[in-house]
Amino acid sequence: MSVRLPSSMSYGEEEEPDVLQKMWEKSKQQPFVPLGSLLTAGAVLLAARSMKRGEKLKTQRYFRYRIGFQLATLVALVGGGFYYGTETSEHKQIREDKLREKAKQREKLWIEELERRDSIIQARKQRLEESKKELRELAKQGFIEEKESNDEKED
């Protein structure tokens, strides 16, 4: 019989957000950063297209747009970092509190699981001892009966 050891993972645990969910949340916090990134990428694509067509003036204009969009994206990123910097420390404290609470919950579940398994083991040991006791009594009775039957045969 295979017995699984108790896991330190809680069963009702919510999953950590994946990369796309994290990106979506950060994009909602700082919407100008992804917008600037998209505009920069668009400017580079337009510059590449105009370069392929041989339109030098449009190519230069699109590369200048790219520089402007990159600057705006960088300003939005730094500004958002300063703005959300204090809020981030508050979020960090809240997250640490949640992690501590989750660790306490896991420890509690772990202890409950170990106690449950220990009670099962103790019950099995008790049943084993009772079975051994019954077998000894049956063996003793059988031995006594055999002895009595041997004594009767000898008489």
Swiss-Prot record:
The keyword Transmembrane helix applies. Keywords: Coiled coil, Membrane, Mitochondrion, Transmembrane, Transmembrane helix. InterPro entries: Hypoxia_induced_domain (IPR007667), RCF1 (IPR050355). Residues 4-95 form the HIG1 domain. Pfam families: HIG_1_N. Belongs to the RCF1 family. This is Respiratory supercomplex factor 1, mitochondrial. It comes from Candida dubliniensis (strain CD36 / ATCC MYA-646 / CBS 7987 / NCPF 3949 / NRRL Y-17841). The gene is RCF1.
